[in-house]
Structure formats: C-alpha cells, structure tokens
C-alpha cells in the first residue's frame, strides 16, 4: 500500500514540476502578435476560400499588413475593401476580381451522380456541404460562398456552379442601413405646436 502511495505522490510531484516549467516557458517565450493583423483578420469574411491567392484569411491579413493589396477578397466585396482602406489609411480600390454584372454562383450537386466520397465536404472552407460517407451530399445555398473549391476534387464531376437568382427572398436586406426615426420623439416641440393650433 505504501509503494502505491509513493508512486502516486511521485507522479503528482512530477506533474506539478512539469506544469510549473510549462507555465514559465509560456510566459518567457511568448510571441507577440501584430495587433494590426488581428484587426485586418477581424474584417475579412473568414471563408478561407483561397481566392485571394493565400491559403486563408489570416495569411492574407498578414500580407496586407506587410503592404499587399487590399482588394483581393471576392467574398468580402467592396464593403470589405472600404473597411480595410479605412483601417489602413489608404484609398479604397476597386476589386481585383471583376464582380460587376456577375451573378453570384453556388455549388449544386447532381445527387444521381454522387457516390458519397466526402471529398467535396473536406474541400469546402465554410461547411456548406452536408452528407456522410456513402451517402448523398447536398449544398446549403445560403452558406455557399461560390468559391468553387469543391468542384475540382469531385471524382464523378457531379458538382457544378449555378447562378443564384436574386429575388426578394434571397436578397441580403441591410435593414440597419436606413435609420428609423420617430418624428414625434425627434422634434417634441412640433407636436405641442400642432395641439395649440387646433
């Protein structure tokens, strides 16, 4: 019984010692991140699609902080370019990708050809494809960014990019863009003057 207690005590002592060493090392060898990179990364849409030429949003944020162009993110669009220009103190540029007149496209899986290999699921950076191994897959069109990274890995070519028609149901309404002001609260004197005139 005493040998078990000695072994448990020795393991606890070693765990405490290694924990203290790791704690000290994490403080002593801490790598400071550039705060501008974190701010740029927060503005980017985090689709990790690679259309900018970088493997994800964080590497692109680091490249922008080092002087790369701010107009390479198609999912972010012009709004992201303007936010980045404001943050970086530069003039907003037009998108490097010709998005004028282009209809947004989303992936569509022809389910009769799908073999359930899950290669498209692994390639999708935003988890817009659902399905399981040896089961049919489908695309959640509201989540799809149209990056077409899922098309190339498909061994049966059952994925195609189809245009998403803009309707009143699919339009991205920006309800906060137009401020709603209650006139009676905005100008309380006008209500009392109307009452006095009557």
Curated annotation (Swiss-Prot):
> Which keywords does the record carry?
4Fe-4S, Cell inner membrane, Cell membrane, Electron transport, Iron, Iron-sulfur, Membrane, Metal-binding, Repeat, Translocase, Transport
Leading EC class = translocase
Main localization of the protein described in the UniProt heading: membrane
Which residue numbers delimit the 4Fe-4S domain?
32-90
Protein name as it appears in the record? Ion-translocating oxidoreductase complex subunit B
Q: Where does [4Fe-4S] cluster 1 bind?
A: 49, 52, 57, 73
* Oligomeric and partner information: The complex is composed of six subunits: RnfA, RnfB, RnfC, RnfD, RnfE and RnfG.
Q: Which residues bind [4Fe-4S] cluster 3?
A: 124, 144, 147, 150
Q: What does this protein do?
A: Part of a membrane-bound complex that couples electron transfer with translocation of ions across the membrane.
Classification via PROSITE patterns? 4FE4S, 4FE4S_FER_1, 4FE4S_FER_2
**Which free-text remark accompanies the cofactor?**
Binds 3 [4Fe-4S] clusters.
Give the HAMAP family listed for this entry: RsxB_RnfB
Matching entries from InterPro entries are given as:
4Fe-4S_dom, 4Fe4S_Fe-S-bd, 4Fe4S_Fe_S_CS, Elect_transpt_cplx_RnfB/RsxB, RnfB/RsxB_Proteobac, RnfB_subfamily
GO MF assignments: 4 iron, 4 sulfur cluster binding; electron transfer activity; metal ion binding
Q: What is its EC number?
A: 7.-.-.-
- The residues that hold [4Fe-4S] cluster 2 are 114, 117, 120, 154
Region Hydrophobic: start-end pairs: 1-26
Q: GO terms for biological process?
A: electron transport chain
| Subcellular location field | Cell inner membrane
Which intervals hold domain 4Fe-4S ferredoxin-type?
105-134, 135-164
A cellular component term, taken from the record's GO annotations: plasma membrane
Q: Which PANTHER family match?
A: ION-TRANSLOCATING OXIDOREDUCTASE COMPLEX SUBUNIT B, OXIDOREDUCTASE
Name any cofactors this protein relies on: [4Fe-4S] cluster
Q: Which organism is it from?
A: Vibrio vulnificus (strain YJ016)
Family as reported in the entry's similarity comment: Belongs to the 4Fe4S bacterial-type ferredoxin family. RnfB subfamily.
């Amino acid at each position: 019984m005493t040998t078990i207690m000695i072994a448990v005590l020795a393991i606890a002592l070693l765990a405490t010692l290694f924990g203290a060493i790791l704690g000290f090392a994490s403080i002593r060898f801490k790598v400071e991140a550039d705060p501008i990179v974190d701010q740029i990364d927060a503005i980017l849409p985090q689709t990790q699609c690679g259309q900018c030429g970088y493997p994800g949003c964080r590497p692109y944020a680091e490249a922008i902080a080092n002087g790369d162009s701010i107009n390479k993110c198609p999912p972010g669009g012009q709004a992201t370019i303007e936010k980045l220009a404001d943050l970086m103190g530069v003039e907003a540029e037009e998108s490097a990708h010709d998005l004028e007149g282009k209809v947004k496209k989303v992936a569509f899986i022809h389910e009769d050809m799908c073999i359930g290999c899950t290669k498209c699921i692994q390639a999708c950076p935003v988890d817009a494809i659902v399905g399981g191994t040896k089961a049919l897959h489908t695309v959640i069109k509201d989540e799809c960014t149209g990056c077409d990274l899922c098309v190339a890995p498909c061994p049966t070519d059952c994925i195609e990019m189809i245009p998403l028609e803009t309707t009143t149901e699919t339009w991205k309404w920006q309800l906060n863009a137009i401020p709603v002001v209650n006139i009676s609260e905005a100008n309380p004197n006008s209500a009392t003057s109307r009452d006095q005139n009557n």
